[in-house]
Amino acid sequence: KFSKLEDINQLNFKPIFLDDGLIFFDKKGTIIRYNNNKKIVWKNNHYSKPEKKLKPKLNFSQKGETLIVTDNIAKYYSVNINTGELNWSKNNTYPFNSGIKIFEDKFFSIDYKNTLRCYNINDGSECWNLKTEDTFTIASSKFSLIIINDVLIFSNSIGDITAVDIETGLIVWQLPTQSSSIINETYNFKISKLVSDGNSIFFSNNKNEFYSIDVKTGTTNWINDINSNLTPIVTGNLIFTVSNDGYLHVIEKNKGNIVRINDLYLNYKEKKRKDIKPVGFSIDNSNLYLTNTDGKMII
């Protein structure tokens, strides 16, 4: 049983799924490994009493027997996945606000100051960092990063999309998607996670913009008018996304043409509709599953 996490609808933290169970955390930052029978294999907390009171929220990534952890109170550390024991622990200057990507002997994360940081997975030493333009307010959504070949591509709080060489940290290309005025407005700016088919990168925001950009050059393929900060799903030649007011959009991947729009909140009364927002969605061969801020799922 997990201790309660506040604002669960606003969280974007995922457990690590293993062949024989999963790993997650509670509100005090305790990491817990469960087996497939829901029994605790181990549980360990690597925080001091003052740190526990801050209710750290953890990001996980795994390589072999190593679990890499970053959090929103500026710690990052490595844990043995079999025992839960600490391999090493370090502190960053600022809290982290992204997931973690691992590439060979390095891992990457972005902090609240829009700085991409590259660390050595074996001892936590910093290999390099790349600062992008900062803002005066705290971002309201987590930053996203993906790795394609030997290039890491990431977003920041002002909507810049930046591609860097994994080994050197040098910028390959950068695409600003917002005007300079966004620097003062990031408290309500939200951007989706980046997704890619290997040739293009797709993402959207709550400023009514859905982008397709070229992986190699960062040039814009097309932009469409869709207001969404949910992670889009690419399947075949189609992109699926759900707007913040509950409309499913099906988009042709190469040209950006909208193939279909469906109102997923059609059965909600107008008053109720104003009070709910989509949280996330997934699709299979025949169904779409949409979770909402009211705790219900639409299929």
Predicted feature residues:
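Extracytoplasmic beta-rich repeat domains
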Residues: K1-D19, I40-G64, E85-E104, E126-N149, ...
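Structural signature of WD-repeat beta-propellers
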Residues: D19, D26-K27, N35, D71-N72, ...
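Short loop/turn segments that connect beta-strands within beta-propeller blades
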Residues: N35-K39, N80-G84, N120-G124, I166-G169, ...
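Beta-propeller domains
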Residues: S157-I158, T168, S196-N221, S228-N229
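C-terminal closing repeat unit and adjoining cap/tail of repeat-based domains
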Residues: T217, K255, N285-N287, N292-I299
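Redox- and metal-dependent alpha/beta enzyme cores, enriched for Fe-S-associated oxidoreductases
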Residues: N244-V250
